[in-house]
Amino acid sequence: MEDPLLLGDDQLITRNLKSTPTWWMNFTAELKNVSSMAAPMATVTVSQYLLPVISVMVAGHCGELQLSGVTLATAFANVSGFGIMYGLVGALETLCGQAYGAKQYTKIGTYTFSAIVSNVPIVVLISILWFYMDKLFVSLGQDPDISKVAGSYAVCLIPALLAQAVQQPLTRFLQTQGLVLPLLYCAITTLLFHIPVCLILVYAFGLGSNGAALAIGLSYWFNVLILALYVRFSSACEKTRGFVSDDFVLSVKQFFQYGIPSAAMTTIEWSLFELLILSSGLLPNPKLETSVLSICLTTSSLHCVIPMGIGAAGSTRISNELGAGNPEVARLAVFAGIFLWFLEATICSTLLFTCKNIFGYAFSNSKEVVDYVTELSSLLCLSFMVDGFSSVLDGVARGSGWQNIGAWANVVAYYLLGAPVGFFLGFWGHMNGKGLWIGVIVGSTAQGIILAIVTACLSWEEQAAKARERIVGRTLE
């Protein structure tokens, strides 16, 4: 059983808190707490990110048509399905995290169960859309053969989406209690399980690209199984795996109250990146532009898992301490997350900039592509900085419970600022893919600025009071 990360009065030096020596001691302690969670969570996110990527890579060896169809289906499925599942459970980072801090342990199990039940009908609705994905793509002007492969792949992804409806709440159930090592072991085991299963279904069973999609579903359900077994039999979850039926209806209401804006935060951001790739096909020399922007997007997405891990750790620490009534510790968790972001982004940006002349060869042997990637490397380094900052502050929003503000911030940042700037520079400014990527940076920068202003203006004492009212208010009546 892992040690709890909540800081009690005996662990936090409260006397003369604003003095430099005392503040630094508390900050160092909190930095250690956030770091101990951020590293495992980043590894968990990397493992989960690589799982569908491996399926795309294996399916791509079935032929160019299969690669195009699978890539198209994956992009659409991420925005219309998996992104929604990932976003909705952001509500649990608020509710379960603050309930754990407030020692309302049975509510953690109730919130998690209500999330799973609430996710299932949403999966059914999304699945109906996926059944007609091929016809949708054809109506949007996509190649009929590619659309047929994409539609078939999407239908085979439905079991994976249903698994995510269970896996994501279980992940947040453990994360918000600081139980990140079980998540780490399960994620790595699942990734190792997925590789042979994918190869067997695609080649040994002759299922082709559809086998790659089915392998994702099998691997996700395998992860659900081992997570569920841990939750059921581990003594670390003994207090929190309970269920209170009287709180179920209220829990569902609260889940959607925070889950819908949280899902909006995710899908608004993810959809802009997919729109970027689709738009690159309308530029002069679309093959080059699409290839280079796909490389930039892949690199940026892979890097983002690190600040996402920091954001998840920060979210947990903030929600735990607000629920426990420790606003000063929650404030320190914000500073700790920002410090880790700056350190990580500086290292990764410096490394990429140093290798910018050879970086493109990791993806292509074409000198034209490599030279273009080199030209965009400076912008990609800047993306590392601003995207990481936004990811950490997204965690602050989820931990504090102001996802609705975060959703509106994303609308303003990405669709009122980022997208117009990108399209103007890319098409009318004749900067092509470079202009589109500048639009992404503008959107991420605007998002970070808005979230930073909101965070700076927060009254943490008020946030702690809201957390207590949110979690235990009904109990105290």
From Swiss-Prot:
In terms of CDD domains, this protein maps to: MATE_eukaryotic
Could you tell me where this protein is found in the cell? Membrane
Membrane topology term: Multi-pass membrane protein
UniProt-listed InterPro entries: MATE_euk (IPR045069), MATE_fam (IPR002528)
Any one Gene Ontology BP term? xenobiotic detoxification by transmembrane export across the plasma membrane
Specify whether Transmembrane is a keyword of the entry: yes
- Note the superkingdom of the native organism: Eukaryota
Q: What would be one Gene Ontology cellular-component term for the protein?
A: membrane
Q: Which UniProt keywords apply?
A: Membrane, Transmembrane, Transmembrane helix, Transport
Q: Name one Pfam family in it.
A: MatE
Q: Where are the transmembrane segments?
A: 38-58, 72-92, 113-133, 146-166, 187-207, 211-231, 263-283, 292-312, 333-353, 376-396, 411-431, 436-456
Q: What molecular function does GO assign, one term?
A: xenobiotic transmembrane transporter activity
What coarse category fits the chief subcellular location reported for this protein?
Answer: membrane
What's this protein's family per the entry?
Answer: Belongs to the multi antimicrobial extrusion (MATE) (TC 2.A.66.1) family.
List the PANTHER family.
MULTIDRUG RESISTANCE PROTEIN
Name of the protein this chain belongs to: Protein DETOXIFICATION 5
Q: What is the lineage of its organism?
A: Eukaryota, Viridiplantae, Streptophyta, Embryophyta, Tracheophyta
Query: What is the name of the gene encoding this protein?
Result: DTX5
